[in-house]
Amino acid sequence: MGLRFTKALSRLFGKKEMRILMVGLDAAGKTTILYKLKLGEIVTTIPTIGFNVETVEYKNISFTVWDVGGQDKIRPLWRHYFQNTQGLIFVVDSNDRERVVEARDELHRMLNEDELRDAVLLVFANKQDLPNAMNAAEITDKLGLHSLRQRHWYIQSTCATSGEGLYEGLDWLSNNLANKT
């Protein structure tokens, strides 16, 4: 009886875990976001060949975040990270108008994968500090997010270097994880 009570309490009050896959085109700011969340500071980054993985503790949730490189040659490897992913963070460089269609195509290709059918989608419209950045509404339109009828999604304006918007995104993820468990 005591064990059952302890398990019930830990389910209610214990730390939840969430596996997050963070992807996007190269130079969108994925690694900067990861280490801003993990360390609270800006780190010097180089293009990610392969992946970085860190655990980010936030609001009683342990987010295991896999940051996977976004160069076109290694995007086919993204699918190797899909299994058991509960949340997908897709990072977009809001200032890169020339590649937003490419970003849309990669996002929709990924979302068609069966292994990601239950994953919630958080889009970080990053680099909002730049003067010509597209706002969240424009990114929503250009990525075709309204067409995702069977997918639970949210878009958050962010600036990885200042940290603006990052924790609001994690709030959305944590609330949606709580609703799914």
From Swiss-Prot:
Catalytic reactions of this protein: GTP + H2O = GDP + phosphate + H(+)
SMART domains: ARF, RAB, SAR
GO molecular function list: GTP binding; GTPase activity
SUPFAM superfamilies registered for this protein in UniProt: P-loop containing nucleoside triphosphate hydrolases (SSF52540)
Short name of one Pfam family: Arf
Biological processes annotated in GO: protein transport; vesicle-mediated transport
Binding site for GTP: 24-31, 67-71, 126-129
EC number per UniProt: 3.6.5.2
Keyword Nucleotide-binding: yes
Subcellular location: Golgi apparatus
UniProt KW Nucleotide-binding keyword: yes
Entry superkingdom: Eukaryota
Family to which the UniProt record says this protein belongs: Belongs to the small GTPase superfamily. Arf family.
Name the record gives this protein: ADP-ribosylation factor 1
Organism, as annotated: Chlamydomonas reinhardtii (Chlamydomonas smithii)
